[in-house]
Amino acid sequence: MMLEPSIDSLQKRIKSKYSLVTLSARRARQLSETNQPLVEKSKSHKFVGMALEEIEAGKLYIEN
């Protein structure tokens, strides 16, 4: 079974695995409260999956 989006494609956007987990968890919590995804047609129906798709699409990022 292949996960979408892949960890490799996500790490092109967010270099640190730990930052990736933190960002996706925070966004998933926001999505659970508001249910307003930034991507139009999400493949996932779970909030963490939606958050990862937003990161891959470049809608979420970490400011340095």
From Swiss-Prot:
It catalyses: RNA(n) + a ribonucleoside 5'-triphosphate = RNA(n+1) + diphosphate. Coiled coil: none annotated. One of its GO terms (biological process) is DNA-templated transcription. The keyword Transcription applies. One of its GO terms (molecular function) is DNA-directed RNA polymerase activity. Keywords: DNA-directed RNA polymerase, Nucleotidyltransferase, Transcription, Transferase. SUPFAM superfamilies: RPB6/omega subunit-like (SSF63562). Its EC number is 2.7.7.6. It is an enzyme of class 2 (transferase). It comes from the Bacteria. GO terms for cellular component: DNA-directed RNA polymerase complex. Belongs to the RNA polymerase subunit omega family. The RNAP catalytic core consists of 2 alpha, 1 beta, 1 beta' and 1 omega subunit. When a sigma factor is associated with the core the holoenzyme is formed, which can initiate transcription. Promotes RNA polymerase assembly. Latches the N- and C-terminal regions of the beta' subunit thereby facilitating its interaction with the beta and alpha subunits. This is DNA-directed RNA polymerase subunit omega. It comes from Oceanobacillus iheyensis (strain DSM 14371 / CIP 107618 / JCM 11309 / KCTC 3954 / HTE831).
